[in-house]
Amino acid sequence: MTRRGTFILCVALAGLSPVAASAADWPQWRGPAFNGSTAETGLPEKFSRTENVLWATPLPGPSGATPVVWGDRVFVSSVDEKTNRLLALCIDAATGSVVWKKETGQNRQAPRNNMASPSPVTDGRTAWFFYGTALLFAFDVRGDLLWSRDFEKDHGHNALMFGYSSSPLLYKGKLYIVAIRNRQQDLYGRGPPGQTDPYLLAIDPKTGKDLWKQPRVSDARGEVEEAYSSPIPYEGGGGSQILVFGADYLTGHDAETGKELWRWGGYNPRRINHWRIIPSPVVGDDLVFVFGPKHSPMYALRPKGSGLLDNSCVAWTFGKTVPDAATGLYYQGMLYVPDDDRRVMTCLDPKTGTPKWQIEMGGSQVIRASPLGADGRIYCMNEGGEVIVLASGDEPKILHRAEMSDRELTRSSIVAAGGRLFIRTTEKLYCLARAAGPRS
């Protein structure tokens, strides 16, 4: 059966349980393995704005949200620069034509950000779009609205200096949403007076109803209360867990009940009150990798036990060239750590933290997008829209460069699905494929 036929069959089976993602899909922010990697092969080795371009679809505005891909559909969150409205888009993966477009509320501006930053998620039948306004929409693949929720109305305002940016997680039949936010709702002039607590929430993806809500308590005070990281699953310690990172702690929660099983808080011993967290955890080799704020060290953890864990759970640390915003990549048994401001990539042995190699990627802009691992390569993109392709493995090598945009603030991570690359710039979504030919 063709990929298109498989997708149509999934739609026809709308009353059944969710279908499993194949290696050719990219269903949520960090991909099918939740670590930025995919088993995709046959991707184009060289490309540009005119070379190996299958299609290039203009977008109504910028966003840090990563496109998600299932079969012949691409789902994209955006903002319309002309109307300042938030949008949910469905694009045909074969042609680049817009299948449907839905308005999803009013945008709010935040410093260097907008409310379309969280990435959508899909299971092949439903696409869930979440926004920094805390509005969540579930659409079927035809674009019909199944349900919507206003989490600010139900669970309080998300007060973060740069606007809420955490992406939802679909895992084992639940949709997880995390709000690691400042307790003072009106701190940045965007919310009502009063205080509200951070939380981890599980909802029924079919109905949108809350299954449980777990308070995410912390003694952090100041901007350090805020985190832009996303929840990540972890199969460790004898069961399925959801990892939540920010507000001075990494916590592991029972995926079924939300109960906090353990927490570790060793990355901010001086209690610096502006150390907000942006990168999400990465899991690999039975370890959890977390990246401290503002280029402070990263840590590899073995979180065994319960309650408050001490630093005996730290397997190793690395602090020379580490990110502030981008999330690291676990790919083919290696850990790739971007220093997003210095534009340096380091390849580490994930078991020991020993550097295998390090390479300067160059370019004139910082990197905020997280790297992709696919087809034996590492794909990075800086804020100016320049893509840098590195060889994965034992030797550092830059394989290709491509200027894909003329505008700054390109922050969406590159994804691979169905033998193609999807690159979102400030103004366009590119679909790149081998032998697609030149584009005028």
Q: Where in the sequence are the language-model features?
A:
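Noncatalytic, solvent-exposed loop/strand surfaces
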Residues: A21-S440
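Short amphipathic alpha-helical "recognition" segments used for binding
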Residues: T6-F7, D210
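Bacterial N-terminal signal peptides
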Residues: I8-P18
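N-terminal secretory signal peptides that target proteins for export/translocation
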Residues: M1-R4
